[in-house]
Amino acid sequence: MKVYNTLTNKKEEFLTLVPGEVKMYVCGPTVYNFFHIGNARTFVVFDTIRRYLEYRGYKVKFIQNFTDIDDKMIKRANEEGSTVKELGDRFIKEYYKDADDLNIERATKNPRATEFMEEIIKFVSDLIEKGYAYEIDGDVYFSTKKFNSYGKLSGQNLEELQLGARINVDERKKDPMDFAIWKSQKPGEPAWESPWGMGRPGWHIECSCMAYNLLGETIDIHAGGSDLSFPHHENEIAQSEARTGKQFAKYWLHSAFVNVNNQKMSKSLNNFFTAREILEKYDADVLRMFMLSGHYRTQINFSMELLDSTKAALDRLYNSINNLENLLDEVKNEELRDEELEYKNELQKYKEKYIEKMDDDFNTADAISIIFDLIRDVNTNVTIESSKELVKYTLDLIRELGSPLGILQESTKASLEEEIEKLIEERQKARKEKNWALADKIRDNLKERGIVLEDTPQGIRWKQI
């Protein structure tokens, strides 16, 4: 298996610290709002990578944190007149609801920064003791110049960064790029007692501390959105390696942005969507397949039209699954015949190709294409004449390949029939009202999904093609 390591800017053989085990840390949400589709892509991508590693036999210890104390949390809590803890409690609950709806598996542990205050204070104290940090008026800063390899993850040059950072710089800092690892209390802010007075941790130290305490000095994979590469992950490396003298993470994985209608998603452009808004209109399978239809290191463009296209493609897959489920009830032959054994072995090539693509830096886009190829093959060759054993095998294989992607696990019969009957009713109503455009649109939509309508003396019937 090969993974692209941001630290070295190349694909590397994936070799874990302990054979068969993966220690993985993913930067989670700051819990002051509902997560948006850009966050959703990050969560879906690393959920998929975790699932695939488990599919390949690894035991994965998967940690994803909650940032429940920082400037954004304090600002939002003050705006709505709540405490930071109340705000965090509320949006952690909302995160779990949306993540569950998106079929994201629960982490081994979701630590909250505020649960690790004692350990964070110890971490900061150790950095001061080792000469990597200094205190001024209750604030503690990390000295970037003391850490010789600062910038190695993002490819930034410290001297150039310092030149660019001289505007609005805190004059108390020894160098412009030094960053706060402990912040003294300001009026109205939550604070904890420390050797430097009342205060709270900086954002970067929180992740370093939680990773260290839950996974150890060196971890296999550290991951997050590409926007976190600098300064957040760069600063995590500096703090962690300064404290332990050991490599912090072996492999760094970063997922790319989601653009909306070819523009970067932002509230100011009014093109900002939460995952919850999208999940009200589309199933989790649709959103997951859309998020995984491009390579995780490549930006994807989001639009409702693209989601509709993904839904139509997914419907075709589920139509085929539905046909197989029906065949399972209808076929007469129970056991695999000799001539079917060869075909069953041929189907294994799809699994082999799927693994080959996913083993190459988790290429979900190509893996999805292989599932489509498999289903096209099965649609042609698995029929009412096939044995029950072959039909069941093909169904199990499709679900097996869908499982690491978090898709194609539903039983389709009832839900598909109910949805189609509802659309037929809507079309009948449109025809009675002489709304021919809507009636034609519904018919064309069904046809695109492989459903053909037939007028019979008993009324409208539908069949799959």
UniProtKB/Swiss-Prot annotation:
Keywords noted in UniProt: Aminoacyl-tRNA synthetase, ATP-binding, Cytoplasm, Ligase, Metal-binding, Nucleotide-binding, Protein biosynthesis, Zinc
Segments carrying motif 'KMSKS' region: 264-268
Location relative to the cell: Cytoplasm
Record motif 'HIGH' region, residues: 29-39
Keyword ATP-binding among UniProt keywords: yes
Taxonomic superkingdom: Bacteria
Any coiled-coil regions, as ranges: none
Classification via Gene3D superfamilies: Cysteine-tRNA ligase, C-terminal anti-codon recognition domain (1.20.120.1910), HUPs (3.40.50.620)
Co-factor requirement: Zn(2+)
GO terms for biological process, alphabetical: cysteinyl-tRNA aminoacylation
Name this polypeptide is given: Cysteine--tRNA ligase
